[in-house]
Regions:
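Structural signature of the two symmetry-related core transmembrane helices
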Residues: 75-88, 269-284
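Glycine-rich segments within core transmembrane alpha-helices of 12-TM secondary carriers
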Residues: 134-150, 334-342
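Short amphipathic helix-loop junctions that connect adjacent transmembrane helices
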Residues: 29-45, 223-240
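A membrane-interface helix-boundary motif in multi-pass transporters
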Residues: 154-172, 348-356
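Intracellular juxtamembrane helix-capping segments at the cytosolic ends
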Residues: 112-125, 306-319
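Loop-to-transmembrane helix entry/capping segments in MFS-fold secondary transporters
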Residues: 43-44, 127-137, 237-238, 321-331
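C-terminal membrane-cytosol helix-exit motif in multi-pass small-molecule transporters
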Residues: 152, 171-190
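Helix-to-loop junctions at the C-terminal end of transmembrane segments
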Residues: 60-72, 156, 254-267, 350-351
Length: 356
């Protein structure tokens, strides 16, 4: 295939991010309403479903074994296709077992894609351009999320689309983009051949520790921050939706700039700033009683997520270039260890005292 000017690895990463977001944002936006209205879920069933969703993330290290039989770029397309199919058919299985199965399929695609995307990003991007491009990928994903939310609002408010139709469109768009990428882009070669076995190196210990803490921080935010907004501060559905909208608008506008800043000041300073900021935000959550200030903390909490790209660029600088693929799977597994115990253990702490 004759390579055209737009057929670049960076553009492929952008389209991959859009495809993933079209499917995953649709699934996330519809989940709670669909499982309650159509599948009659209680807390028990939604807890099981969320646990099932995390299993593929915990098993992400197995991606390296699949790379023995399929190239990484093709594996990314296949993973996006699985994500798209899982979302597209979700509306046709309004039962506990049906949703458990479609969720697992969707999650396998999502977590394998995220694993391979990290590996490909660090292989294709130079050390100089990686922070800026990774920030722009977050911005593009946020813009795609805004498009999904706007479409969902119009589709349900004015055209009364069914759940089945919306799931089909969200997952189908991801599947179609996967096919377009497969047909429209050449196979990009990695400068360094990748090792196809599991690797744990002592000199990567700090990267593993940062990855684990990043997973713990993600669980605290995704599981408890929104719950706190509703239970303690009385936020309505529209209030929560407004917070989501503001978060994505900020990411769209500033994530690329944050990536540039990381490249300029370095990973050490960026992560130090993030963790100091998170310490202040988490401490303030325990003492703030005003709903508006709580919303400000929620937005700041989310904004700090963008600085986490410094963990990836730090690894890119210290790692053997041949370790990118194998370490990406190990890192995702480490990141999801926290998902096993934090929701349950911190949930029990919540029952004693939310301020703790």
């Amino acid at each position: 295939m004759l390579k055209k000017s737009w057929q670049t690895p960076t553009n492929l990463l952008f389209i991959m991010s859009v495809a993933m977001t079209f499917a995953f944002a649709t699934w996330m936006a519809l989940l709670n309403n669909f499982v309650i209205e159509r599948a009659y879920f209680t807390g028990k069933e939604i807890g099981i479903l969320q646990s099932i969703r995390e299993i593929p993330g915990f098993l992400a290290f197995t991606a390296v074994f699949l790379l023995l039989v399929v190239k990484e770029q093709a594996f990314a397309y296949i993973s996006l296709a699985l994500l798209g199919v899982g979302v597209a058919i979700s509306g046709y299985f309004p039962s506990a077992v049906g949703l458990y199965l479609t969720t697992f399929l969707m999650s396998v695609g999502f977590h394998y894609y995220e694993t391979v995307k990290q590996s490909l990003s660090l292989q294709w991007l130079s050390i100089e351009e990686a922070p800026s491009v990774l920030g722009k990928l977050i911005a593009v994903s946020s813009l795609a999320s805004l498009i999904v939310y706007a479409f969902l609002w119009i589709a349900q408010s004015y055209f009364f689309f069914s759940y089945e139709t919306i799931y089909l469109l969200g997952g189908g768009s991801c599947l179609c983009l996967s096919l377009i990428m497969w047909l429209g882009f050449p196979s990009f070669k990695s400068v360094t051949p990748q090792r196809k076995h599991l690797i744990l190196r002592k000199r990567y210990w700090l990267y593993y520790a940062l990855t684990f803490m990043g997973g713990a921080r993600r669980q605290i935010f995704t599981v408890f921050a929104g719950f706190l907004m509703v239970e303690k501060f009385g936020y309505s559905v529209s209030n929560i939706a407004a917070l989501f909208l503001i978060n994505h608008l900020f990411n769209w506008g500033f994530a690329g700039k944050i990536g540039h800043i990381v490249g300029k000041i370095g990973e050490r300073r960026a992560l130090t700033f993030e963790y100091c900021g998170l310490f202040l935000v988490f401490t303030a959550y325990a003492f703030v009683d005003n709903a508006v200030w709580a919303g400000v903390l929620y937005i700041l909490d989310h904004l700090f997520f963008s600085l986490a790209i410094a963990i990836k660029t730090y690894f890119q600088k210290i790692a053997d270039p041949a370790d990118m693929a194998s370490t990406a799977g190990v890192a995702f597994t480490i990141n999801h260890i926290a998902a096993v115990f934090i929701p349950v253990s911190f949930g029990l702490v919540w029952l004693v005292s939310p301020a703790m």
